[in-house]
């Protein structure tokens, strides 16, 4: 019944998000610590919010993370049927939380196919056109979402307005006009 630190879980209970006065759904949930309670109660700490309004029925595939500048530190106690959350003050983390223990995954993994395609399609909305991608190399040990996956993609070389992205890519010696880019895809 007690959730161990380092385990990722969802808190998509509509009653929780409707109680939130932050106006955004909470998305990525990382167990920073846990406490003993009754037989079916545990305590968790949340780290990130999405841009989806609280109380909306928007699917997670259409939500994006808010920037790291404003994030909240939440705690909840949950039983089998109810979720209660208390909002604390805004915190500004020094770095993003770890998403779990990495392990090698099959390039044709069904668990990664849909969330990765959603992430790639969101990236495709950028001025840069992604033409091919290599299979992901690593993913967290947990097979349920949220996931983090490292992938290498080929992309056409970018224009000046995407120079920051271009700095993370290396020109492809064998294919003129293309670049190899290492990317980490986080999906909640």
From Swiss-Prot:
Report what the protein is called: Kininogen
The membrane spanning regions, by residue number, are none
What is the recorded function of this protein according to its Swiss-Prot or TrEMBL entry? Answer: Inhibits papain and ficin (cysteine proteinases) but not trypsin (a serine proteinase).
Entry comment on modification after translation:
Bradykinin is released from kininogen by kallikrein.
Glycosylation (residues): 36, 150, 182
Gene Ontology biological process terms, A to Z: vasodilation
**Keyword annotations from UniProtKB, A to Z:** Cleavage on pair of basic residues, Glycoprotein, Protease inhibitor, Thiol protease inhibitor, Vasoactive, Vasodilator
| Disulfide bonds listed in the record | none
Q: Name one GO molecular function term.
A: cysteine-type endopeptidase inhibitor activity
């Amino acid at each position: 019944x007690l959730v161990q630190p380092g385990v990722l879980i969802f808190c998509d209970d509509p009653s929780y998000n409707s109680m939130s006065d932050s106006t955004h759904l909470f998305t990525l949930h990382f167990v920073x610590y846990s406490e003993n309670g009754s037989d079916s109660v545990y305590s968790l700490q949340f780290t990130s919010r999405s841009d989806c309004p609280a109380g909306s029925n928007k699917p997670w595939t259409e939500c994006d993370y808010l920037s790291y500048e404003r994030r909240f530190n939440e705690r909840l106690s949950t039983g089998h049927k109810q979720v209660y959350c208390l909002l604390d003050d805004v915190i500004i983390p020094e770095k993003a939380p770890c998403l779990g223990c990495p392990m090698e995954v099959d390039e044709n993994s069904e668990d990664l196919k849909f969330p990765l395609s959603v992430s790639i399609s969101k990236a495709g909305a950028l001025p840069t056109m992604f033409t091919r991608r290599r299979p992901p190399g690593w993913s967290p040990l947990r097979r349920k979402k949220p996931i983090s996956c490292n992938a290498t993609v080929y992309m056409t070389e970018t224009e000046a307005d995407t120079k920051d992205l271009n700095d993370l890519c290396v020109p492809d010696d064998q294919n003129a006009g293309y670049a190899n880019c290492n990317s980490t895809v986080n999906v909640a």
